[in-house]
Amino acid sequence: MREQERKLSNGIEHCLSKTQEYVDMESAKAISIFSSKVNSNGRWLAEISGKYELKESGELEAFRLLKEDHVKMLDQLEGKIEYYEKLLDELTEFTSEIEIKRKIEKNRRSRHFNNV
């Protein structure tokens, strides 16, 4: 029985050792890939930093406020457009009603003059 326990213990230790080797190898690969990407990104950042300048936070805030103002003005303009579209619809309807009333009045007058 003692011999079986020793063999089992040795087998478990061997499995643990192989598992640890695998984990260490994969960790080293992942660290190497990560380090390579960090270095690559650092070089790319240095390259584009020369091409593009970053805006100051105050300037970015000014742009944000300007954008908000323009959005508000657009909203107001859209409201005015909707108002004038409704007004146009009402004026078109009013014009149609006036035209109908004018025709009715014309017919009434012509009947009146024909009867006289």
From Swiss-Prot:
Protein species of origin: Vanderwaltozyma polyspora (strain ATCC 22028 / DSM 70294 / BCRC 21397 / CBS 2163 / NBRC 10782 / NRRL Y-8283 / UCD 57-17)
Coiled coil: 57-97
Protein name: Biogenesis of lysosome-related organelles complex 1 subunit BLI1
Tagged with keyword rRNA processing: no
Highest taxon, organism lineage: Eukaryota
Leader sequence segment: none
Quaternary state and interactors: Component of the biogenesis of lysosome-related organelles complex-1 (BLOC-1).
Keyword terms, alphabetized: Coiled coil, Endosome, Transport
GO biological process: endosome organization; regulation of protein localization
Family membership noted in the UniProt record: Belongs to the BLI1 family.
Compartment(s) where it occurs, according to its Swiss-Prot or TrEMBL record: Endosome
Any one GO cellular component localisation term in the record: BLOC-1 complex
Pfam families according to UniProt: BLI1
Task performed by this protein: Component of the biogenesis of lysosome-related organelles complex-1 (BLOC-1) involved in endosomal cargo sorting.
